[in-house]
Curated annotation (Swiss-Prot):
It comes from Oryza sativa subsp. japonica (Rice). This is Cytokinin dehydrogenase 6. It catalyses: N(6)-dimethylallyladenine + A + H2O = 3-methyl-2-butenal + adenine + AH2. The gene is CKX6. The keyword Flavoprotein applies. Belongs to the oxygen-dependent FAD-linked oxidoreductase family. GO terms for molecular function: cytokinin dehydrogenase activity; FAD binding; oxidoreductase activity. The modification Pros-8alpha-FAD histidine is found at residue 94. GO terms for cellular component: extracellular region. SUPFAM superfamilies: FAD-binding/transporter-associated domain-like (SSF56176), FAD-linked oxidases, C-terminal domain (SSF55103). InterPro entries: Cytok_DH_C_sf, Cytokinin_DH_FAD/cytokin-bd, FAD-bd_PCMH, FAD-bd_PCMH-like_sf, FAD-bd_PCMH_sub1, FAD-bd_PCMH_sub2, FAD-linked_Oxase-like_C, FAD-linked_Oxidoreductases_BP. It is found in: Secreted, Extracellular space. Keywords: FAD, Flavoprotein, Glycoprotein, Oxidoreductase, Secreted, Signal. PROSITE patterns: FAD_PCMH (PS51387), OX2_COVAL_FAD (PS00862). Monomer.
Length: 527
């Protein structure tokens, strides 16, 4: 069974590994979509790598569709061909391990669909109907925000970075600081338009074609291409009280985070909860000011870190939403929440910003990094879901073990989520405990040798988790064997393979995930 499902994985070579591609069927270029295909070197080169800049794999062509129907035509052609070829949708290419690549196949430039008007439509609700937005899968979340705010509405859950596409995040899960209350973005989807691996165009929801609906949400692009998502909305606030609290003790930090996302506290507390970790010398040797912290703040935090035995400090990042009518009460509400917490005395930092400024906060950091040439660099990121019961072991073994002496460039996230806000009918994998931590090791390689060093550290992190039985799950996963994928999906694996047979029997879609090789239906059935 394992031999039949073996996968040709990309081999690391320096910063990039290169996958040799084959050819496309000649009659494709006589097909009706041929005029939308580009095969020139510049176009295929742009679709040959992603945000991670770790893996490179050249497609044979790039499709610039004017309509979703043209994508369906391409997929149907591949599925009916004697030699099916890979098809991978690409939005912003924000994957880190080549997940949006299509070696030897066709990359679909989903952003080309954005040229058409009317791809974001807001229904304000009323008369008992709840508000929602219909957004094309190619739309950036920043554009969805802009469109919904015109109606005084907004989605409930946001990723930290908004210059990524709707379909891209929904194919993974879409997590952020609001997810403890509302679940991931996929839990807030009402309906989808999907193109399956057979080339069928299907509208699905919890009640209509539910197998496809739950498969595609968090399905890593394995069962269909999302071309439209209907997403629930809520009234949008005008302002945000943005707070960061510093901790020198991890036990206190995690206890307070878990209190903040508990049902009792969250109903009257922060609307957003995340956390970050600062290691060792990053405060003293990093930037002297940030979009949030002033130079004076950073000097104080560096002093706190120097007094800590481990040199590690932790931040709870919280946000309270409010409007003009609740301005007078937000300070009282914040004071009430802070009285329940045990952050290091005097280390509370607040800012008052607009709702848009808060949601789009990473944009300012992006501008700074671009200006100094540190945005378009390799990003050997590793994102994990760590069981709440083992987060202190992870802290000791990784943050104060594997990373001892490290001076990472980038961000380390660490914050809890409630598992009961995830729908197990979806193929997306969450943490094992009732509460689990998101740990994002979002580090950048900025000098020669960094990629290899950071990859070794990532491998050491995974080895520690495996050897100690931590029970971590990868988010935005990447595995080097099908045994890894089998373990990742756990009890869902058999269902995942059944859904693959049903919706993409030739293994056409999103080959960059490297879950399945290109398979015939009979080979899949025999797994």
């Amino acid at each position: 069974m394992a031999a039949r499902c073996s996968i040709a994985f990309m081999v690391m070579a320096s910063c990039l590994s290169v996958v040799v591609s084959g050819g496309l069927p000649g009659d494709l270029f006589a097909h009706s979509v041929a005029s939308k295909l580009r095969v020139d070197r510049d176009t295929t080169a742009r679709a040959s790598s992603d945000f991670g800049r770790i893996v490179a794999a050249a497609p044979e062509a790039v499709l610039h569709p004017a309509t979703p129907a043209e994508i369906a035509e391409l997929v149907r052609f591949s599925a009916s061909s004697p030699s099916p070829f890979p098809v991978a949708p690409r939005g912003q290419g924000h994957s880190a391990r080549g997940q949006s690549l299509a070696p030897g196949g066709v990359v679909v430039d989903m952003r080309a669909l954005a040229a058409r008007r009317g791809r974001v439509n807001v229904s304000a609700g009323g008369a008992g109907a709840a508000p929602y937005v219909d957004a094309g899968g190619e739309q950036l979340w920043a554009d969805v925000l802009r469109a919904t705010l015109e109606h005084g509405l907004a989605p409930r859950v946001w990723t930290d970075y908004l210059r990524i596409t709707v379909a891209g995040t929904l194919s993974n899960a879409g997590i952020g600081g609001q997810a403890f209350r509302h679940g991931p973005q996929i839990a807030n989807v009402l309906e989808l338009d999907v193109i399956t691996g057979r080339g069928d165009m299907v509208t699905c929801s919890r009640d209509k074609e539910p197998d496809l609906f739950f498969a595609v949400l968090g399905g890593l692009g394995q069962f269909g291409i999302i071309t439209r998502a209907r997403i629930g909305l809520e009234p949008a606030p005008k302002r945000v009280r943005w707070v960061r609290l510093a901790y020198s003790d991890v036990v206190t930090f995690t206890r307070d985070q878990e209190l903040l996302i508990s049902k009792r506290a969250s109903e009257a507390g922060f609307d957003y909860v995340e956390g970050q970790v600062q290691l060792n010398r990053t405060l003293t040797e990093g930037p002297k000011s940030t979009p949030f912290f002033s130079r004076f703040d950073i000097d104080r935090l560096a002093g706190l870190a120097s007094e800590s035995v481990s040199g590690v400090i932790y931040f709870i990042e919280g946000a309270m939403y409010y409007n003009e009518s609740t301005t007078a009460s937000v300070d009282q509400k914040l004071t009430s929440v802070l009285e329940q917490l045990s952050f290091d005395k005097g280390f509370v930092f607040t800012k008052d910003v607009s709702y848009v400024q808060f949601l789009d906060r990473v944009r300012e950091e992006e501008r700074i990094l671009r200006s100094i040439g540190m945005w378009d660099v390799p990003h050997p990121w590793l994102n994990l879901f760590v069981p709440q019961s083992r987060i202190l072991d992870f802290d000791t073994g990784v943050l104060k073990g594997v990373f001892v002496g490290a001076n990472p460039v980038g961000v380390i996230l660490m914050y809890p989520m409630n598992r009961n806000m995830w729908d197990d009918r979806m193929t997306a994998v969450s943490g094992n405990d009732d509460m689990f931590y998101v740990v994002g090791l979002l580090r950048s390689a900025v000098v020669p040798g960094d990629v290899e060093r950071l990859e070794r550290e990532n491998e050491a992190v995974l080895a520690f988790c495996d050897n100690e039985g931590i029970g971590c799950k990868q988010y935005l996963p990447h595995y080097a064997s099908q045994d890894g994928w089998r373990s990742h999906f756990g009890a869902k694996w058999s269902r995942v393979t059944e859904l693959k047979v049903k919706y993409d029997p030739y293994g056409i879609l999103s080959p960059g995930q490297r879950i399945f090789s290109s398979l015939t239906p009979m080979a899949l059935v025999a797994m």
